[in-house]
């Protein structure tokens, strides 16, 4: 169909910020689960959230969450305000995909063995993060699109 790809590409450009926001919400949920667990899990007579290594993982979760939130919000803002969104859209997909994946990895470090149980909610986020990582293009694809949009 003549001109069909252009219409599809415009639709995908409008869909990616929604997907990025969904992944950001997943990061937020993983963060909340991990912080709650680190406050209630007692080891050696103290909550595990007091241990420096656990705090390091929580800080990494916050960093991933903030990066995903800022880039997703910028992409949505540019689309909503009628500005040229291509660079922000591709950047949001790269950052949010990697953030959700890495946030789940850090959450598994905080939770240790309990995180691998299917009854525990973290496994749902881990599966979703791996699935959505490549949905509508993996980060490598979007890095190439971002470079092309920036003229690099």
Residue ranges and their predicted role:
Residues 1-6:
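Long, acidic (Asp/Glu-rich), low-complexity accessory segments flanking structured domains
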Residues 10-152:
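Alpha-helical interface subdomain recognition
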């Amino acid at each position: 169909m003549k001109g069909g790809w252009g219409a599809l590409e415009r639709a995908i450009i409008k869909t990616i910020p929604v997907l990025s926001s969904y992944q950001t919400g997943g990061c937020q949920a993983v963060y909340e689960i991990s912080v709650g667990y680190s406050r209630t899990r007692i080891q050696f007579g103290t909550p595990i959230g007091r241990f420096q290594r656990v705090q390091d993982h929580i800080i990494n979760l916050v960093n991933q969450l903030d990066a995903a939130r800022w880039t997703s919000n910028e992409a949505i803002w540019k689309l909503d305000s009628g500005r040229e969104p291509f660079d922000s859209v591709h950047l949001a997909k790269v950052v949010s995909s990697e953030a959700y994946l890495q946030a789940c990895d850090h959450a598994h470090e905080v939770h240790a063995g309990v995180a691998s149980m299917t009854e525990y909610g973290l496994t749902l986020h881990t599966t979703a993060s791996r699935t959505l990582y490549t949905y509508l293009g993996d980060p490598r694809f979007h890095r190439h699109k971002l470079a092309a949009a920036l003229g690099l």
